[in-house]
């Protein structure tokens, strides 16, 4: 028994799959951003424990460059702000996509029950 799905249902299933893939991409991107944010926070915590006259080196390309602790903290604070903003943006996208996904899933389920009502629901064997 190989029934073909109605075109409308096929279209909705494709849209559902696209939403799921989009949600997965957003979740993965947010995970990367959150990981970077945790790393920046760790480095900032470590820097705050060091005396202000501590010599700090930063990797720039293939070089280690001596840098001022205050400059590094400022740079990391700026990076932290940007990462937090990006994380919130991804979180908002994720929430929106989850809502759209739930609505699309509900629509697909309604279409499935319309096109394929349960057979033998009232029949007894």
UniProtKB/Swiss-Prot annotation:
List, alphabetically, the InterPro entries matched. PFD_beta-like, PfdB, Prefoldin
CDD domains named in the record = Prefoldin_beta_GimC
GO terms of biological process kind: protein folding
Identify the keywords attached in UniProt to this record, alphabetized: Chaperone, Cytoplasm
Asked if the keyword Kinase belongs to this entry, the reply reads no
The UniProt GO MF terms for this protein read: unfolded protein binding
Q: Which Pfam families match?
A: Prefoldin_2 (PF01920)
Query: Where does the record place it?
Result: Cytoplasm
An example GO CC term for this entry is: prefoldin complex
UniProt main location, coarse: cytoplasm
Q: Does the keyword Cytoplasm apply?
A: yes
This protein's source sits in the domain of life called Archaea
HAMAP family attached to this UniProt entry: PfdB
What is known about its subunit structure?
Answer: Heterohexamer of two alpha and four beta subunits.
Query: Which family, according to UniProt?
Result: Belongs to the prefoldin subunit beta family.
Function noted in UniProt: Molecular chaperone capable of stabilizing a range of proteins. Seems to fulfill an ATP-independent, HSP70-like function in archaeal de novo protein folding.
Q: What is this protein called?
A: Prefoldin subunit beta
- This chain's source organism reads Sulfolobus acidocaldarius (strain ATCC 33909 / DSM 639 / JCM 8929 / NBRC 15157 / NCIMB 11770)
Its gene? pfdB
């Amino acid at each position: 028994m190989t029934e073909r799905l109605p075109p409308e249902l096929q279209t909705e299933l494709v849209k559902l799959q696209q939403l799921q893939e989009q949600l997965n991409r957003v979740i993965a991107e947010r995970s990367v951003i959150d990981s970077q944010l945790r790393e920046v926070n760790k480095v900032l915590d470590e820097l705050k424990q060091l005396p202000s006259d501590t010599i700090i080196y930063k990797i720039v390309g293939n070089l280690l460059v001596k840098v001022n602790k205050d400059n590094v903290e400022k740079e990391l604070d700026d990076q932290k702000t940007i990462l937090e903003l990006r994380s919130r943006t991804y979180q908002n996208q994720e929430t929106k996509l989850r809502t759209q996904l739930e609505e699309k899933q509900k629509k697909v389920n309604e279409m499935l029950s319309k096109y394929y009502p349960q057979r033998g629901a009232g029949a007894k064997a």
